Structure formats: structure tokens, C-alpha cells
């Protein structure tokens, strides 16, 4: 189990300040934003869809947890480490083998670090594949599309720089003492809404998206009662 989990939880316990591990939550937020928009573009009904998360390290675990919190129809997970799978199953995910996941999932997200893990013949026609390992993905997006994927992207396209500036700015603007999962969802929805009609996510160089994330996170923190308005 990654040590970052324990470190983040301990910092949250000790500090009355917002704490966020970007490799976990920044990646999860941008991935959720991309999933929201790719479903819009491909006609997949997200709340009824089957999503498969391959690899449950820091990023993969956070992606699966946020997908569950958002209400994705079914979240399937697979990892060679049973200790990584157990917390996700307890949260509502279904544990499965890789081959079964690839056969059943409408949306496949990979964060394994294993180049070439997914073979072209394993891609199901109409599937969405986010192969996010850097610098080399589990399957090249062009190869996945040629094999029948409706959409495919790698880690360069799903950039967590879209998330963390606005999340922190939004939390700090209202003196929030912590960052709640609903604030991450608000950030993901703001990123998704900032994309163009034919985009899955906007450019991280867009100032508009960072302002939108800031406002969404601040408003969400206030609605949740997490804003420390006495200090504003």
C-alpha cells in the first residue's frame, strides 16, 4: 500500500488546513472530468455505465473512489495486491480479473505503469480507454482507436495541472479546514463544463478553467459548512 495514503491522512489529522496529495486527487479529478465529457461525446450514460479501474496505486485508488462518490453505475477494480483491492470493495466496487474487466467495462482507466499491458485484441469496439501511465501508456491511444475504441487518451492528455491550482485556491479563499470529496466532484464538473463542445478536457493553459474550478470549490466548501467565514 503506498505510504502516501498514511502520510496524507496523518497530515489531515494534525493540521487544520487543506491537505491534498496531487498524484491521487488531482489525477482523479481530471480523470472524472474527462469521463463526464467523453460520455457526453460518445453517448454513454455515465450513471448506468460500467467503469473498470486497472491498477490501484495512489492515482488508481483515488480515481475509483471518486467514481464511486460521483455515482458511476458500476466500478470494477483489479490489482495484483489484494490489500489494495479490499478498501475499494468495501466502498462498493467489484473486484474482477483483468480479462473480465476489459470484456465488460464501457470505460477503462489504467494506472499500472506497465507498457503494453492491453493488447489490441482485448479492446472492445465502442469502448473508452484512458491509459494514463507516464511516460509510456498501457496501450497507445492510436492503437486503441484502430482496434475499435470509441475514444482513447494517455496521461499527457489527462493533465492534473487542470485541477490542483483551482482546488487549492478555492479552498484557501474561504479558509476551508479540509477538502471534501464533494469539493473534488465540484472541481471535476467545473473542468468538464470548461471544455469546448468537441473537447474532453480544456487546455491547462486556459485561465478560464482555473477560475471556474476556484469558484466551484469555494462555493461547494461554503455549502458544506467547511468555510471558515469568521476569518474572512
Model-derived features with residue positions:
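Adenosine-phosphate binding glycine-rich loop
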Residues: 20-24, 42, 131-231
Amino acid at each position: 500500500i503506498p505510504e502516501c495514503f498514511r502520510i496524507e491522512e496523518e497530515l489531515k489529522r494534525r493540521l487544520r488546513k487543506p491537505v491534498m496529495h496531487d498524484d491521487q486527487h488531482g489525477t482523479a479529478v481530471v480523470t472524472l472530468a474527462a469521463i463526464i465529457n467523453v460520455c457526453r461525446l460518445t453517448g454513454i450514460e455515465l450513471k448506468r455505465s460500467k467503469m473498470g479501474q486497472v491498477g490501484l496505486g495512489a492515482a488508481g485508488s483515488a480515481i475509483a473512489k471518486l467514481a464511486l462518490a460521483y455515482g458511476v453505475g458500476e466500478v470494477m477494480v483489479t490489482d495484483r495486491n489484494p490489500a489494495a483491492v479490499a478498501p475499494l470493495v468495501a466502498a462498493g466496487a467489484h473486484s474482477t480479473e483483468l480479462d473480465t474487466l476489459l470484456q465488460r467495462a464501457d470505460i477503462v482507466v489504467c494506472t499500472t505503469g506497465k507498457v503494453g499491458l492491453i493488447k489490441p485484441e482485448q479492446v472492445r469496439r465502442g469502448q473508452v480507454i484512458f491509459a494514463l501511465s507516464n511516460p509510456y501508456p498501457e496501450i497507445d491511444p492510436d492503437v486503441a482507436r484502430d482496434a475499435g475504441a470509441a475514444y482513447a487518451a494517455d496521461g499527457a492528455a489527462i493533465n492534473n495541472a487542470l485541477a490542483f491550482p483551482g482546488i487549492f485556491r478555492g479552498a484557501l479563499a474561504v479558509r476551508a479546514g479540509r477538502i471534501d470529496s464533494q469539493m473534488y466532484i465540484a472541481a471535476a464538473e467545473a473542468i468538464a463544463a470548461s471544455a469546448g463542445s468537441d473537447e474532453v478536457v480544456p487546455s491547462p493553459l486556459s485561465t478560464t478553467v482555473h477560475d471556474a474550478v476556484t469558484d466551484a470549490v469555494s462555493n461547494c466548501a461554503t455549502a458544506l459548512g467547511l468555510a471558515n467565514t469568521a476569518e474572512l
